[in-house]
Structures are given as structure tokens and as C-alpha cells.
Amino acid sequence: MDSLLGCGVSAAAREPVPRYLTSQPRVSEVAMQSAPLEQPAKRPRCDGSPRTPPSTPPATANLSADDDFQNTDLRTWEPEDVCSFLENRGFREKKVLDIFRDNKIAGSFLPFLDEDRLEDLGVSSLEERKKMIECIQQLSQSRIDLMKVFNDPIHGHIEFHPLLIRIIDTPQFQRLRYIKQLGGGYYVFPGASHNRFEHSLGVGYLAGCLVRALAEKQPELQISERDILCVQIAGLCHDLGHGPFSHMFDGRFIPRARPEKKWKHEQGSIEMFEHLVNSNELKLVMKNYGLVPEEDITFIKEQIMGPPITPVKDSLWPYKGRPATKSFLYEIVSNKRNGIDVDKWDYFARDCHHLGIQNNFDYKRFIKFARICEVEYKVKEDKTYIRKVKHICSREKEVGNLYDMFHTRNCLHRRAYQHKISNLIDIMITDAFLKADPYVEITGTAGKKFRISTAIDDMEAFTKLTDNIFLEVLHSTDPQLSEAQSILRNIECRNLYKYLGETQPKREKIRKEEYERLPQEVAKAKPEKAPDVELKAEDFIVDVINVDYGMEDKNPIDRVHFYCKSNSKQAVRINKEQVSQLLPEKFAEQLIRVYCKKKDGKSLDAAGKHFVQWCALRDFTKPQDGDIIAPLITPLKWNNKTSSCLQEVSKVKTCLKF
């Protein structure tokens, strides 16, 4: 049976099927859609009110009117709700109703029933079976009308539950249409025009694909429709907190504008999600679709951000939204354990598509072989106590493909995400925003004014902050913004800071606390025969980039568990040596790129020599790339340093301390 349900078939056919229903073919989509379809009205945007009003709570036992049954989401129906529906349609014979009760046929299984299956279950009357199938088909058709379809260039036609549509049709979510996925990368890769909006749709969809496949393969996990909805919502909303130009905002701008603020976009995402729910009054809508807001909002936020700082009292399980028996649900959207999650799957496929780069990872194959296994851990405080945790595992033969996945991630970082000019443009936009920050006003809650850097403190203000701020500053008539405008005009005219070259530390990596003083080091590393040009620290930009497999210097596969065909319940680990001798020895490295803000030939010649001298003093690798310094590399002897050179390093570091 195909385990990739939800990745190309109708939403009604994505539900787990009981064993007694798997021997016969499913009802075709054609049969399910045989009833005449009315042309649906256009879905409204941003007003928070979809065409179909939210249903009453999924417990339908108290419902009697036809319209009430038509408008409820049958995926939330329990067996008793199915019996209530059948009674309402005239099937009042206890024997027939008991068939549905005894076999625990929930609403999600109704689309898979046909005459043969009903006969196998014990519905003997042909007339009764035909009448029952007709009722179920009408019900299935109404459910299809509730779902909305998006034509996505990556995943094809993807369907979303009405609750997800309510979330999508809010100003807070629509804001993602105006935030570039790759920030300044669009100025280097002309195809990289995609935004956080479509990526978020893709992650929400893939989250549903994976969790439904697990629910079908392993019904004993008791994954409910409520769980599935929450996982999809987390996927949909995981990037709500991104600022202008995506990672540029929380990775470069905020650390420089507010160095005391340890803020990341994940924090912004959970705050924006709360604002989205409250300002659009979605808690009642969530209840109407079977969610429990008090628990499920916490669960959704935990999937995005990770466990709370303060764990649950007297418990080894750090989460509050779901118990430890459903620990695997936290590994779908943002996998803190090993980094294998649907967020990566979508941006691999989507970014490669728009960048014109080949994507070699097939997420559908991973879903095909994914299953949940229980892993035992010994608790450090008490070696005798063993904690059992359920993890998403893959077949042992897939280990090579997972190494390829992380290699793909590394390649994307090298070729696109950390492209030397993409990063440079992000740096220049950051410089412009820092110049503009004191003079830009954004109206927030109760009319309070915020700056670009303080909008993260108020979600109403942050909702208004998108990539559009670039054009607002560029075209402003405020003379106070002239410096910022000059930088932005230089970006548009391709008059960029000059790239000098790239190097790497041979031994210890540069620590974060050292980053700020690196330009001073370069400025002070003046060679003996340097041109008579004075260069200051502010003339240099030193960009330190850490490239890894997603877990700093650790091998992420060491934290992945596998199962074998002979025993699908036992989780095992696979060492790197068991896979291949050609796999990397190190899983992280540091790149150091240096740029110069001055652009005249004399200054650039001097800056190049400063950079080469600095690399020699710090015992970094010979600089590569930068045309300006290429002729200067050969004469220097990196491996035979004199004591005076080492003394110079000490002098430079000593000066910088004061």
C-alpha cells in the first residue's frame, strides 16, 4: 500500500485505512466527485472570513439538520458521530449501526467504503448498501468543497483544511508575500524571486504528508486529526517571524542595531502566531474544528521554537503540548534532534528550482521508509532508569541518502546562501537600515511609534515591516535618510563594496566575541612596503561564515536512528565507518571574507596588502579569489614564519585589547 498518501492524491484519500479495508481498491476520486459541482465563490483575502463558515464542534451527535452534517469536517468524526449521521439518513437498524461501532469506522474511513466492503462488513441488503454509498458520496463531495486547492510549482495541486485557510487569509500571514526567501540573493540569482509565503505553504503541506503517512502505517500511534492539524499549522506558521530580507534581519541587522537583544526569527514566529490568533479571533474557530486552544496553541508554538525554558515540573519530558508518547510529532516541522525535517525538504526543492541548481534529495522516498521506533536512553542522574522515547526512523539502506541530504544543504550554502556577493548585498542593506533606523517610524499598537529595530517588540508594528521598507527609504523625501539612500542606490547601480578575498583558520575557529575587533586587526596589519594610504577599521568588513551540516561540528547522522527490514521495531545507529570511507572527516569549517568600502585603485591596492599581511600574521590559509591580491600570494612564506612575524601578531592583539 502506498505510504505517500497526501502527496498527490485527493485530501479525502489521505486518511489511514483499517486493515479490513485494505484488500479492496479504494473508491476513485471520480466516484467521489460524481455529484454535480457548483462553481465555488472566489476565496476572500485577508478579511478572516472564508466562504464556508466554520462548522459546529465535531461531535455531531446533537446535530440533526442536513446542512449541519454537510458543513462539518468528516475527518473529525468518531464512530458514534458516523452512527448519528447514518441514523439521520434513515439507517436506524441496530445491527447495521453496531457494524460501524464494532469495527470503529470513523469519519475519515467513509470515503474508502464501497459496496463490496460494506457486504464484507455484514450489510447484507443490496438496496441498503447502494443507499448508504450514495449518502457517503454526497458527504464526501461536501467535504471536497470545504477544502481549498493551491497550484504550487514544486508540489503540484495541494489541498488545505478550512482552518488552515482561515490562518492563511490573515494580514499576518499574507505579510509573508512581501519577504524574499533568499534576501539579497535575488540580486545575484535572477530566479530567486520567491517569498516566504509559498515556502510556508509548502512546509504546511509536507508536514501533513509525513504525519498522515505515519498515521496510516502505524495506527497504534493513535495520531488524531487534531494532531495532524496542529502539525500542519506549525509548518504553515514556522516563518511568521521573519523580518525584511529574511535571515539578513535577525542574522545581521538586529545583532548590530540591538546587540543586547538575543532575538531570533523563531521567537518572532511564536509571538506573531499569538497575535494572528488573537487579532483574528481564531480560538473559537479552532474549537469548532476540534482543537483545544489551551493545549494546542502551546503545542504549535513548541514545534516552532522548541521546548520551554522551564520544563514541566518533576518531569523528564520538557514539552507541555503533547505527552512523551507522541514525542515524534516534534521532529516533523523543526527537528532539533538531527535536523531532518519538512522545512528543509521544501526549501531544498523550492530554492533549487528558483536558483537553477539540481536538487538530489527525494523527500518522497524518505516518507516511504519513515516509521516510528522506540529508543531507550539511560538517564544521566540515575543510570538504572531507562527513558523510552519514540523517534522518526528510516531504513538502514537510506543512510547514504541522508548523508547526501546534508551534503545538498552544504552545497546550497556554499553556492547560494553564502555567496560572496549575496552576503555583501545583505551587509550593504544592513548598513543602509542602520543609517535609516533613527528616522523611520512604524505605527504599532494604540498608535505608538516604532523604529525598524524596535518593531519586533510590537507585533502590530512588525506586521507592517516587510521588504517594502527598502523602497520606502530609497524613495523618501526626508533629507535625514540621504546616507541610507546613497547605499541603497549603490546596490541598485551595482556600485558595491569591493571583495578582497577569502581565507580560513588553520587551527582554532574565531570566536563570536572576536568578530567585532577583526576589522581593527586588518587595518593594523600594515605591510612594510604598503602604499602611502591610511586605512581605518571602518574601511574594512570582515564577514565570518560558519558552514556545517546543521549541527556545528557534529555529524547529524550520529543522532539518526534506523531500523532493519528483518526487525522494523528495533532502532539502531549506524557509524560513519560502516557507510563509506569517502565521507567527510570534519562536519564544519569557517570561512573569512574581507571587503573594502573604499573603491579607488590606490586604496584597494593597499587594502589587498593589508588583508594578505593579516592572513600571514594570523596563520590563516593563503587568500583565494579576490583578483586584487592574487599577485601578492606567491612571495609570502606561510609555513616558515619568523619570530618577528609572530611577535607582530602578539602586538596587534595586545593593542586591540585596549
Curated annotation (Swiss-Prot):
Positions carrying Phosphoserine: 49, 55, 64, 125
Classification of source organism: Eukaryota, Metazoa, Chordata, Craniata, Vertebrata
Observed effect of gene inactivation: Mice are viable and fertile but show increased cellular dNTP concentrations and impaired ability to restrict retroviral replication in lymphocytes, macrophages and dendritic cells. Mice also display interferon (IFN)-beta-dependent transcriptional up-regulation of type I IFN-inducible genes in various cell types indicative of spontaneous IFN production. In addition, the replication of mouse cytomegalovirus is significantly enhanced in mutant mice.
Organism of derivation: Mus musculus (Mouse)
Stated consequence of mutating residue 634 to A/V: Increased ability to restrict LINE-1 retrotransposon activity
Subcellular localization: Nucleus; Chromosome
CC cofactor: Zn(2+)
InterPro entries assigned: dGTPase-like (IPR050135), HD/PDEase_dom (IPR003607), HD_domain (IPR006674), SAM (IPR001660), SAM/pointed_sf (IPR013761)
Induction, as annotated: By interferon alpha, beta and gamma (IFN-alpha, IFN-beta and IFN-gamma).
PROSITE patterns: HD, SAM_DOMAIN
Binding partners and assembly: Homodimer; in absence of GTP and dNTP. Homotetramer; in GTP- and dNTP-bound form. Interacts with MRE11; leading to stimulate the exonuclease activity of MRE11. Interacts with RBBP8/CtIP. Interacts with RBBP8/CtIP. Interacts (via its C-terminus) with CD81.
Entry protein name: Deoxynucleoside triphosphate triphosphohydrolase SAMHD1
Domain of life: Eukaryota
Binding residues annotated for GTP, in chain numbering: 148-149, 169, 174, 177, 494, 498, 565
GO-annotated biological processes: dATP catabolic process; defense response to virus; deoxyribonucleotide catabolic process; dGTP catabolic process; DNA damage response; DNA strand resection involved in replication fork processing; double-strand break repair via homologous recombination; innate immune response
SMART domains: HDc, SAM
Activity regulation annotation text: Allosterically activated and regulated via the combined actions of GTP and dNTPs (dATP, dGTP, dTTP and dCTP): Allosteric site 1 binds GTP, while allosteric site 2 binds dNTP. Allosteric activation promotes the formation of highly active homotetramers. Isoform 1: Phosphorylation at Thr-634 impairs homotetramerization, thereby inhibiting dNTPase activity, leading to reduced ability to restrict infection by viruses.
Phenotype for residue 109 to L: In LCH mutant; abolishes formation of the tetramer and deoxynucleoside triphosphate (dNTPase) activity
Modified positions ((Microbial infection) Phosphothreonine) in chain numbering: 634
Boundaries of every HD domain copy: 196-348
Domain SAM: 77-142
Renumbered residue ranges of the record's region Disordered: 23-68
Binding site for Mn(2+): 199, 238-239, 343
Catalytic activity: a 2'-deoxyribonucleoside 5'-triphosphate + H2O = a 2'-deoxyribonucleoside + triphosphate + H(+); dATP + H2O = 2'-deoxyadenosine + triphosphate + H(+); dCTP + H2O = 2'-deoxycytidine + triphosphate + H(+); dGTP + H2O = 2'-deoxyguanosine + triphosphate + H(+)
